[in-house]
Amino acid sequence: MKSAEIREAFLGFFEEQGHTRVPSSSLIPGNDPTLLFTNAGMNQFKDCFLGQEKRAYTRAVTSQKCVRAGGKHNDLENVGYTARHHTFFEMLGNFSFGDYFKRDAITYAWTFLTSEKWLNLPKEKLWVTVYATDDEAYDIWTKEIGVPAERMVRIGDNKGAPYASDNFWTMGDTGPCGPCSEIFFDHGADIWGGPPGSPEEDGDRYIEIWNNVFMQFNRTADGVLHPLPAPSVDTGMGLERVSAVLQHVHSNYEIDLFQSLLTASANAIGCSNDNQASLKVVADHIRSCGFLIADGVLPSSEGRGYVLRRIIRRACRHGNKLGAKGSFFYQIVAALVAEMGSAFPELVQQQSHIERVLRGEEEQFAKTLEQGLKIIEQDLAELKGTVVPGEIVFKLYDTYGFPMDLTGDIARERNLTLDEEGFEREMEAQRVRARSASSFGMDYNSLVKVDVATQFTGYSATTGSASVVALYKDGQSVTHLNAGEEGVVILDTTPFYAESGGQIGDSGFLLAGDARFDVSDTTKTGGAFLHHGVVASGSLSVGVQVETQVADEVRDATKLNHSATHLLHAALRQVLGEHVQQKGSLVDSQRLRFDFSHFESIKPEQLRALEDIVNAEIRKNTPVVTEETDIDTAKKKGAMALFGEKYGDSVRVLSMGGEFSVELCGGIHASRTGDISLFKIVSEGGVAAGVRRIEAVTGAAALAWLNSAEDQLKEAATLVKGNRDNLLDKLTAVLERNRLLEKQLEQLQAKAASAAGDDLSSAALDVKGVKVLATRLDGQDGKALLALVDQLKNKLGRAVILLGSVHEDKVVLVAGVTKDLTGQLKAGDLMKQAATAVGGKGGGRPDMAQGGGVDATALDSALALAVPFVEQGI
C-alpha cells in the first residue's frame, strides 16, 4: 500500500467506527503557548481532554502534521543519519473524549492492523507492551484479543520516579495522565535488536508503530492519582513507520513518499539518487519547510522563524555538499505538492509563496555559505583536540549566519564535538543577531574600516565645526573627493545622527570654502560616523575644516515620529497586553512604522483606543527626560530594552509622561510630548506569523492626512448629492437602489434565458437515445444558467445538458443530467472534464453540477466534450 492509501484507510476505518474526521490543525499551536510547534495529534484536543472545551463529537480521527525541530522535542541533528528521525512527520490518531475506553481502543487498533480488509499485518509479527500494573489492558490483550503471553511485555517505572515510564503518559506534573499500551512490529531476525524492555531494545528489529494512551487519572500536586469521571483515549501511529512496515522496507526513507522526494532532490541538485545522508536531509527538510511556510512561518532571527531558517540553511549546506550549483531547494516544492497536496490542500494554495520564500532565503544564505565553509575548514584544520571552541561556533553564527546545529553537522562528519556552553556564553555576552551581507547594493559599513571614534554632538546641536579625518570612495581610502564623486566622509566630531534603533540617519551638508558635500545618509561602524553622499561642488580633502549643517526640517519631523513611536509602544502594552514586544521599527520624517509581537489582528475599537491614549499623552505636554546610567540601574527602573540590541556599560534612558514610557534609547527626540501635536494611525496589518505592523503620522503630516480624508468625504458627498451630515444615509440609499436594480436585472435575465430555452431545446442532438445539448450563452451568470438547465431538463426529457458562458472575463459552466440517466452518467463527472479544459475546476451532484475557469478561448472545446461523454457512458 502507498502512504496515501494507508492514510485514507486509517481515516476511513475509524469513520466506520463512528469517528468524526477532523482536519489537521496548524503547525502553529493555537491553544498552547508553551509549544513551539504542533508535535502530536492530541495538541489540538488538549482542552477537550482537560474538560475545558466540548465539541459536537466524542470520537475523532485525524492525520496530524507535526514538526519536531527546536525546543524540547528536537530531532534535527539526527535527521538524515538514522532510519526514522524526521523534522516533519504525520501522526495518525483516533481519540475518545469520555466515550469508549481500553477495550474498544485495543480492539480497533488490532482490527485495523490485522484484518484482511485493512492492513492485514501478520499477527505473529506484533508485540505489545502495557504498563506494569495495568492488568485490565493486559487481560484484554491476552484473553480477548489473543496475543500470547510471550509477546506481551509489562514495562514499569523505568525512568527513576513513580509513574515515570515509557508506558505511563502525563500531560505535566499534575493533571490528566494514565497508562499506555504500545504495539511493536518485528522486522525479523536478520536485523539487530531485542524486544521492548530488553537491553537490546534500541535496535531496529522491533519498531513501535502505535501507541494507545488511556487517560484515566488526574494526578494532584501530592502525586496521588484520582480516577477521572470520564476516561479518554489518545492514540498515535506514525504514517511513515507503518508505511515502511507495509512496504517491506526497514528505513522510512525507502517508502514511496520519500522516494519521490529523494528523486526530486537529486534532480534539483544534479547528483545521483544514492543512499546518501545529505540527500535524505534535503528530502526530509523540504517537508518541514514547506508546511511551516504554508502555515505562516517566515525565516527570521528568532522564535519559530529562526527554527525554519536553521532547517533551510541545513538543507542548503547539505545540497552544497552534494555539488549543488545555485539555488536548488525551492525547486523541490513542486514534488512535495504533487506527493502531499491532495491530503493537505494548503500546499497547493501556497505553492508559489513557499517557493518564493525558500528561494529568497537560499539566495541570501548563498552569499555567506561559501566564505563561511572556507573559514570553518581553516579553523578545523588548525584545531588542537576534538572540541570546537565556542568562540569559533559563535563567529560562524554571528558573521556568516551558520546556526549552531549546522556547524555541529560539519563537526560531526569529522568526529568532533562543539563547545555548546562556550557558544551560549558568547551569545549572552554579545546579544547580537546574526549578521549577513546586505541585499541592498553596496554596504559601506562592511567595507569602510577606520580606527576613529567620532564625537557626537547632535543631542543639543544641528550645526558645528569639524575636521575631515578620512575619505572613502567605493570602499577604498582616498585623500580627496572631487565634484560629482560619491563617497563617505568621516569627521572627528558631528551633529549628524547615525542610523540606529529604527531612526534613519541624518541628512544635510558639509561646507569647506567653495566645496559642498551633500549628506544623504549617516551610518556608524565601530565608533566612526559615516556621512554618505556626493560632492556637489569643489573638492574635499582629508584634514580640512568643514562646517556641518543637519537638515533641520527633516530632523525635526523625524524626532517627533520617534517620540510618538515610544508612546505607541507603551499604549500597545496597555491595550493589547504585556506580551507586546517591539520587533522592528522605521522612523523617518514622513511617518513611523512599528512592528510588534501580537497573535491576532487589532480591532477597530482597539486602534481608536491606541490613538486616544497617545494623543492624551501629547496633550499633557510633559517633558521628555533623558538620563545616562548603567544598564542594571536602568532595568531596575523598569526601562524596556530591545531584544538583540547591544548595550554598553552606560545607557541612555528615555522617559515620557513620567512612568508612562521608559525605554533605553539613543535616538533623537522631542523636548516635550506636546511638540508632537497630533498622532494618527493610517494602517495596521500582519507582516509575519505573530507579528503586526502599525504605520502612523504625526504633526503636520497627521493634519495633512486628516485634511485629505476630509476632502474625500466632501467629494463622496457631492457625488451622491449630499453633505457630510447625511452622507451615510445617502450611501445606504444608493446601495439599496443598486441591490433592487440588480435583482430586477436577474429577473430580466431569467426571463430572457427562459425564452432562449424554447429556442435551444430544438438544437439538441440525439446520441444513443439521449438528448445532448451543449451551447454557450455569453453574458449569463451561473444563477441564470442553473435556472435554464432546470427548464431544459423538463423540456427535453431524457437529456444531458452543458451550458457555458463568459461572464465578467471568467468562464461559467453548468451541467445537468436528467435523473433517469444518473445511474450511467453523472453531471459532476462531465463538469470535471469541462472545467479542467478551461483551466479551472468544478463538481456537484449526479444531476446538477457547476464549475468555471479562466481560459475563455477554450470554452468551445470544453462544450464539445458533452457528446463523447455520453457516447462513452451509455
From Swiss-Prot:
EC identifiers of the protein: 6.1.1.7
Cellular component terms per the entry's GO annotation: cytosol
GO biological process terms, semicolon-separated: alanyl-tRNA aminoacylation; negative regulation of DNA-templated transcription
Catalytic activity: tRNA(Ala) + L-alanine + ATP = L-alanyl-tRNA(Ala) + AMP + diphosphate
Main location: cytoplasm
Residues annotated as binding Zn(2+): 562, 566, 665, 669
Cofactor-binding details, from the entry: Binds 1 zinc ion per subunit.
Summary of the function given for this chain in its UniProt record: Catalyzes the attachment of alanine to tRNA(Ala) in a two-step reaction: alanine is first activated by ATP to form Ala-AMP and then transferred to the acceptor end of tRNA(Ala). Also edits incorrectly charged Ser-tRNA(Ala) and Gly-tRNA(Ala) via its editing domain.
PANTHER family: ALANINE--TRNA LIGASE, CYTOPLASMIC, ALANYL-TRNA SYNTHETASE
UniProt-recorded name of the protein: Alanine--tRNA ligase
Species assigned in the record: Pseudomonas syringae pv. tomato (strain ATCC BAA-871 / DC3000)
Gene that produces this protein: alaS
